[in-house]
């Protein structure tokens, strides 16, 4: 259970309040993070989203995680997706498309950190004959994210 990744997903709108009990509460307990707040979060029903949000914010405070903006959330997510690409848990094209979506969610025209992934994903759609090349470029960029952004 990676609370920082959960926070990043939540900030980007990729982790809904309804999923917090399972994704943060239950998984946190399974990972050995045994706090009263996590226990309470883990037993909430999906329709208790306001309470789930409040408890998640409290958990972030308990673990001393500062608030993050969408750009930093996207960077955290990019490291995670890059690791999954390199471990073959996610195809290069799927990973690049997810990061393209994350970049859109940042909603900042000056945010260009994920542009290599975005370019490759967009070109994959229009140049199917160059799939190997673009997959290779996505893997290279994933390596950079894992090595230089950890």
Summary of predicted features, one role per range:
Residues 1-150:
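Acidic, Ser/Pro/Thr-rich low-complexity regulatory regions
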